[in-house]
């Protein structure tokens, strides 16, 4: 009962409002606030009132402007970068090594036979019959050529360039199975380009090159991709360089190692690659001390005599240092080690720690990235390189209907080839140079919040020396179980030394440049400096704002009621009926005080012996006041609410 009574009092007080007008509320605020300035507006003379009003308004605007700047700076989510240097025993990085040639030519020659003959013929047409040593009488398999031919573009007239197929006998486009001598255009007068057409031939583009060397290399790689995409992965692995042939000697610190300590992985660009200290099945190996003697020492045989002649023009080893359990993107982030040289690589470690949302768009494990990570089949950690390549493969499958050979495939998808997807090269070329595709992938992919970078200092020396090369190559040859009359040579041997320069590591860490404490301190400092205010002054200002809103709502409600009453009165003409008239109409239907005749109308009741006796009318009150049983107490009793 007491709760109900209290709630009724509270409701009544809400309906009444603060009980002030706008002017009274402003005067009360200026007289009671602790902020400097408003009190002087109501206490001084007219001139000083105007002066203090202008000053108060000016400094209030200045404070609001400063607050806006600080809040905008805070919402920019800026970071500050701190650099710290630590010293501890560190895990040795994972080391991936590959041969520059992905396959042994002796094992893939049967797959590339037609392509190699066609390549020799192409070189003959480019060089001209006087410089070519190719037998031009051989018949060529031009089925590969027709998908993506190379052409001469004669630009002597820039407004009307002439396009000629390398194997056309005339300008009409007829072709023969063997190259015709005496071409009217040669490499020094014409540019070599690659013609890429859609399957129906309605759309063709030309990919130009500044050198014929680049043109034929890109063309051969594209055709080889078509061939290798149709070969099962197990056969491709068998065609690459085995670990026991590639790795001749291994030493980590004071402990010997061999090819069994390396994890094999197939890379489409470099064939069989091998990773030392990947950490997939065992704990990462630590380095006992900095220096060459405590690092990894390798002697590698590149087998340059078995390189694919037109596919690989670089001789040496490709290597990369990376974190444990991370996929090696060795084509983009690796370095070459030259054959016939001893390459020493000193390593320094940088650890990057980025702030997450909302300070940056980094991700901890890639779970919030909307791109399917195609490299997750390797059980590796997330990286932005994996995301970008997965995104490209996703676009490739959506636009071209097949996946590119260089990237992993999603489930139940096929690699592109000329037989099943005749226009894949045209589609791939357009997608490769598409700016929209690159921007989409860069926008969708995120950097990793925690990353480790290995800074390398590289030095090289000739190895072995002339005085020692004879016995070193003979010993290494015998250890490879080769006959004594077949020795290794300087052209195929690489020696590597990989070690920590020092155990000092740098940690580059991002932290919030402006936190909530910084924001509150600056807001309070500006408010206190310009207006002498505090948090309590803000609460006072909030209170008066609430009262203003409260009074406004009450006035709007009262105005709505007044408008509604005026509309209701406009429906009736004349003055409203009195209470006595309303009671007469509802209690005695036979009584008509003003309109009825003085006596009963006998004609109105022809069948009645006696007309009905009129009822006694009620008192003719002009008003009727009803007092409810439960009298609500006066407002003065509820002022304590």
Curated annotation (Swiss-Prot):
UniProt catalytic activity: Na(+)(in) = Na(+)(out)
A GO MF label: ligand-gated sodium channel activity
Gene3D superfamilies, A to Z: Acid-sensing ion channels like domains, YojJ-like
Regulation: Originally identified and characterized by its inhibition by the diuretic drug amiloride.
Residues modified by glycosylation: 141, 379
Topology with respect to the bilayer: Multi-pass membrane protein
Keyword Transmembrane helix set for record: yes
Subcellular location: Apical cell membrane; Cytoplasmic vesicle membrane
Residue intervals on the Cytoplasmic side: 1-50, 555-641
Record topological domains on the Extracellular side: 72-533
Post-translational modification: Ubiquitinated. Can be ubiquitinated at multiple sites and undergo monoubiquitination and polyubiquitination. Ubiquitination by NEDD4 or NEDD4L inhibits the ENaC channel through endocytosis, intracellular retention and degradation of its individual subunits. However, some studies could not confirm the ubiquitination of this subunit of the ENaC.
Disulfide bonds: 98-273, 185-190, 197-204, 250-257, 362-449, 387-445, 391-441, 400-427, 402-416
Phosphoserine found at: 634, 636
GO biological process entries: sodium ion transmembrane transport
Keyword annotations: Cell membrane, Cytoplasmic vesicle, Disulfide bond, Glycoprotein, Ion channel, Ion transport, Membrane, Phosphoprotein, Sodium, Sodium channel, Sodium transport, Transmembrane, Transmembrane helix, Transport, Ubl conjugation
UniProt GO cellular component terms: apical plasma membrane; cytoplasmic vesicle membrane; plasma membrane; sodium channel complex
Composition-biased stretches (Pro residues): 609-620
InterPro entries: ENaC, ENaC_chordates, ENaC_CS
Short sequence motif named PY motif, residue ranges: 617-621
Residue intervals passing through the bilayer: 51-71, 534-554
Function comment: This is one of the three pore-forming subunits of the heterotrimeric epithelial sodium channel (ENaC), a critical regulator of sodium balance and fluid homeostasis. ENaC operates in epithelial tissues, where it mediates the electrodiffusion of sodium ions from extracellular fluid through the apical membrane of cells, with water following osmotically. It plays a key role in maintaining sodium homeostasis through electrogenic sodium reabsorption in the kidneys. Additionally, ENaC is essential for airway surface liquid homeostasis, which is crucial for proper mucus clearance.
Family: Belongs to the amiloride-sensitive sodium channel (TC 1.A.6) family. SCNN1B subfamily.
Subunit structure: Component of the heterotrimeric epithelial sodium channel (ENaC) composed of an alpha/SCNN1A, a beta/SCNN1B and a gamma/SCNN1G subunit. An additional delta/SCNN1D subunit can replace the alpha/SCNN1A subunit to form an alternative channel with specific properties. Interacts with WWP1 (via WW domains). Interacts with WWP2 (via WW domains); inhibits the channel. Interacts with the full-length immature form of PCSK9 (pro-PCSK9). Interacts (N-glycosylated) with BPIFA1; the interaction is direct and inhibits the proteolytic processing of SCNN1A and SCNN1G and the activation of ENaC.
Protein name as catalogued: Epithelial sodium channel subunit beta
Native species: Bos taurus
